[in-house]
């Protein structure tokens, strides 16, 4: 399993915990152990640039996901095939503001955004109410199990 974190944000983040969480999610969703994931931590100007390039929307956002091999969650009988899951870009500065507004630690917000990004890479979405219920329910379940406590509430921009 190749999970890389590249911190270009200038903010100190517990990168090891992001990797541990990602491995946990891979195991729980039966993602192939050799699947690859890249997590890029960027500052607000870099995130705004990515947001414009990828979504044609101005302003920095919290997390962006760029899927590669269209992998989906597997099962115990049929794990996800080996491949490149994709890239997640997270802006710790935006995460810090969202965490403060929600009343939980910034690192919990970083874990929430990492989980959210991975689920997007696996094909989950929240454009429709039913999709949102499924995605956010799984997100809370995974994060609660990982943290051993209630997951932080979503802080959508």
UniProtKB/Swiss-Prot annotation:
Organism: Paenarthrobacter aurescens (strain TC1)
InterPro entries for the chain: MetalPrtase_cat_dom_sf_prd (IPR023091), YbeY (IPR002036), YbeY_CS (IPR020549)
GO molecular function terms attached to this record: metalloendopeptidase activity; RNA endonuclease activity; zinc ion binding
Matches recorded under PROSITE patterns: UPF0054 (PS01306)
Name used for this protein in its record: Endoribonuclease YbeY
Ranges annotated as spanning the membrane: none
Principal subcellular localization: cytoplasm
Disulfide bonds: none
One GO-annotated biological process of the protein: rRNA processing
Cofactor(s) needed by this chain: Zn(2+)
Family matches, as PANTHER family: ENDORIBONUCLEASE YBEY, CHLOROPLASTIC
EC annotation from Swiss-Prot or TrEMBL: 3.1.-.-
EC supergroup of this enzyme: hydrolase
């Amino acid at each position: 399993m190749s999970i890389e974190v590249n911190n270009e944000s200038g903010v100190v983040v517990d990168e090891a915990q992001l990797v541990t969480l990602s491995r946990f999610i891979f195991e729980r969703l039966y993602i192939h152990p050799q699947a690859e994931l890249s997590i890029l931590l960027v500052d607000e100007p870099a995130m705004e640039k990515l947001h414009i390039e990828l979504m044609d929307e101005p302003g920095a956002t919290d997390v962006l996901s760029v899927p590669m091999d269209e992998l989906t969650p597997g099962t115990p009988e049929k794990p996800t095939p080996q491949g490149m899951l994709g890239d997640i870009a997270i802006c710790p500065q935006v995460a810090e503001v969202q965490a403060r507004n929600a009343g939980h630690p910034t690192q919990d917000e970083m874990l929430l955004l990492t989980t959210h990004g991975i689920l997007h890479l696996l094909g989950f979405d929240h454009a429709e109410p039913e999709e949102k219920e499924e995605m956010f329910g799984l997100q809370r379940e995974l994060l609660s199990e990982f943290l051993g406590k209630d997951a932080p509430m979503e802080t959508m921009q």
